[in-house]
């Protein structure tokens, strides 16, 4: 899980999700692409 000020989709399988007011990127194909805005 990377914590970044600016989260971006890294590959075409990445999805932007807002959970509890926090923007996250989840990726089912490459778990290393997980990010959270912080």
From Swiss-Prot:
Belongs to the bacterial ribosomal protein bL36 family. The keyword Signal does not apply. Keywords: Ribonucleoprotein, Ribosomal protein. PANTHER family: 50S RIBOSOMAL PROTEIN L36, CHLOROPLASTIC, LARGE RIBOSOMAL SUBUNIT PROTEIN BL36C. GO terms for biological process: translation. It comes from Cellvibrio japonicus (strain Ueda107). GO terms for cellular component: cytoplasm; ribonucleoprotein complex; ribosome. It comes from the Bacteria. This is Large ribosomal subunit protein bL36. GO terms for molecular function: structural constituent of ribosome.
